[in-house]
Regions:
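Conserved, well-structured ligand/cofactor-binding cores
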Residues: 1-460
């Protein structure tokens, strides 16, 4: 089918593409907002479909829709949720701040699909019964972010943590020079270093799971301004129950819809925890880049898997591409969080009016963090190789090992020994034999790098 057809809404008639499943209100939004070409993500459209299906079931149970109407709406809404009609959601993300255009887009598409199947329903009077864009869109943010986090991000973080822990066990007895301020410090094992990364990821995951408890609370039922006008008082809880049946996630009605519509504090909180995860990933990525630096003029402690040529002009150069990608994702997520923080402040009186931006940034952050966490695990951490010769050479020349002699020879003599070793570029063991009066056997015991990674007071 080609050409155009005439649709109408409360503002009058409008031309709509002949093969479009949407109607006049969606077309007006397409015409009004040719801004970025960015659309609300697939996960958001999925959530909208699930909400409309749940609302139809709730309204059937409460006696506001006939069985045939509810069944037709549910079938069409679930098809939307399944991704069959994503092309019918063309509205730019930079639109009305309530997301009304996208809510009506869903209502029109679902009504059109129901009509094609033989049941005539109205976008507003039936598909949107008991609802407002002002509670549907915030609910869709909560549902979409919760589902994506549970299905993609949390499993990816679990995989990353497990991968780091496996490498930490493998390298638990391989000592290396520790560093503070990027300067040589007392030794640690690779296993200890990686255990810190694993703990960071575990803590980040726990924080995200805690924030998701609030995201499972839904403002559906608040309708226009939070009072629930034109909705059955039981509607919000009924929708939450139906969503639980559809997704397996224990959604519940928010005690105060006013909170969930006028503010987006739960989304702001979740975004903040995503930013914390991004900071942790940036730290891990930078550590890997430093450890891999070289191979001759850098630290050269590890060799990351070679994934692709690194230069169009320098033959043989290989770069740490995965850690670099991780760092860029982290920067993006931190920027997304800044946008969400500003958007979260835009809840003037009874409604936040930057909801589409919050949805876009939040879902992008969750998605790219999930993807890059798996890449970091599988293409960097699982496969890096330790350059033991380089690591051991640096340990032998590390004058800071003299710290272990402090309880025996005192700080000042230790400092003098360290300075002499550094100045002469000699192993600390050789210099200590000359300056401390300790035997070689005593020094070998006191300066054993692996023993020094176990903490405690040496020399007792």
């Amino acid at each position: 089918m080609s050409g155009f057809r005439i649709e109408h809404d409360s503002m009058g008639e409008l031309k709509v593409p002949g093969d479009a499943l949407y109607g006049a209100q969606t077309q007006r939004a397409i015409d009004n907002f040719p801004i970025s070409g960015l659309r609300l993500p697939r996960e958001f459209i999925r959530a909208l479909g699930l909400i409309k299906a749940a609302a139809a079931e709730a309204n059937l149970g409460l006696g506001y829709l006939k069985k045939g109407q509810a069944a037709a709406i549910r079938k069409a809404a679930l098809a939307v949720a399944g991704g069959e009609y994503d092309a019918q959601f063309p509205i730019d993300v930079f639109q009305t701040g309530s997301g009304t255009s996208t809510n009506m887009n869903a209502n029109e598409v679902i009504a059109h699909l129901a009509a094609q199947a033989g049941t005539k329903v109205h976008p507003n009077d039936h598909v949107n019964y008991g609802q407002s864009s002002n509670d549907v869109i915030p609910t869709a943010i909560h549902v979409s972010a919760t589902l994506l986090a549970h299905e993609a991000l949390l499993p990816a973080l679990k995989h990353l943590k497990k991968t780091i822990e496996q490498r930490a066990r493998q390298l638990r007895n391989v000592a290396k020079t520790g560093r503070t301020h990027l300067m040589d410090a007392m030794p640690v094992t690779f296993g200890q270093e990686l255990s810190g990364w694993a703990a960071q990821i575990g803590s980040a995951s726990a924080r995200i799971e805690d924030a998701l408890k609030r995201m499972r609370r839904l403002p559906q039922g608040g309708t226009a301004v939070g009072t629930g006008i034109n909705a059955d008082p039981r509607f919000g809880a009924a929708v939450a129950r139906e969503l639980k049946k559809l997704t397996g996630v224990r959604f519940e009605a928010m005690e105060s819809p006013f909170e969930g519509m006028a503010a987006q504090d739960d989304a702001v909180e979740l975004s903040g925890q995503l930013k914390t995860l991004a900071v942790a990933l940036m730290k891990i990525a930078n550590d890997l880049r430093w450890m891999n630096s070289g191979p001759l003029a850098g630290l050269g402690e590890i060799e990351l898997p070679a994934l692709q040529p690194g230069s169009s002009i320098m033959p043989g150069k290989v770069n740490p591409v995965i850690p670099e990608a991780v760092a860029m994702v982290a920067a993006r997520v931190i920027g997304n969080d800044a946008g969400i923080a500003v958007a979260g402040q835009s809840g003037n009186f009874q409604l936040n009016v930057m909801l589409p931006l919050i949805a876009l940034n939040l879902l992008e952050s969750i998605g790219i963090l999930a993807n890059v966490s798996r890449l970091l695990a599988d293409k960097s951490i699982a496969g890096f190789v330790v350059n033991k010769a380089r690591v051991n050479q640096a340990l032998a020349l590390n004058p800071i090992l003299v710290t272990a002699l402090n309880p025996v020879i005192g700080y000042e003599k230790g400092a003098a020994t360290a300075k002499q070793a550094y100045k002469q570029h000699r192993p600390i063991m050789d210099v200590a034999l000359e300056t401390t009066g300790l035997s070689k056997a005593e020094l070998q015991k006191l300066l054993d790098p692996l023993a020094l990674t176990r903490g405690g007071i040496h020399g007792e």
